[in-house]
Amino acid sequence: MNLTHYIASIENYPKEGITFRDISPLMADGKAYSYAIREICQYAADKEIDMIVGPEARGFIIGCPVAVELGIGFAPVRKPGKLPREVVSADYEKEYGLDTLTMHSDAIKPGQRVLIVDDLLATGGTVKATIEMVEKLGGVVAGCAFLIELDGLNGRQALGDIDYKVLMNFPG
């Protein structure tokens, strides 16, 4: 199935010169959404994954159904102040400065094998911060899966040697 037909491209959003890749049409089509989730589950099948980790908000939309399908847990990554218990945090670079992500400090047990799932790999800042937190908690990042990679933004460099799966590529 060619999933690119289910991605809307919005020019000059959220600002001039940016093309936003909207996954809403993919989610609105049960067959396409299901296909995308199954593709990620197949990728994860031989990795002995213990936990799915997904950054807010679209990482939840992709990661939760993957976790349910695999019969494992899901750990959310949130912006500061959104999680009620003790957290670990990691800073990452955005276009105009630093931002921070957090996750519960008991979300990952030492030695757990984690699959990080998100909608988009662009510059790699979000996934790099997520990897840092998982490893800080003693987890092992066994792989990453993304619906979309924006080519030319060097996001894959943030992954280092970590294996990853991308379902679609678009120009960055």
Swiss-Prot record:
Q: List GO terms (cellular component aspect).
A: cytoplasm
List the EC numbers from the record: 2.4.2.7
Q: Where in the cell is it found?
A: Cytoplasm
What GO MF annotations does this protein's record show? adenine binding; adenine phosphoribosyltransferase activity; AMP binding
Question: Which InterPro entries would you find in this protein's record?
Answer: Ade_phspho_trans, PRibTrfase_dom, PRTase-like, UPRTase/APRTase
Q: What does this protein do?
A: Catalyzes a salvage reaction resulting in the formation of AMP, that is energically less costly than de novo synthesis.
What family is this protein classified in? Belongs to the purine/pyrimidine phosphoribosyltransferase family.
Please give the name of this protein: Adenine phosphoribosyltransferase
Which species? Streptococcus uberis (strain ATCC BAA-854 / 0140J)
Taxonomic lineage:
Bacteria, Bacillati, Bacillota, Bacilli, Lactobacillales
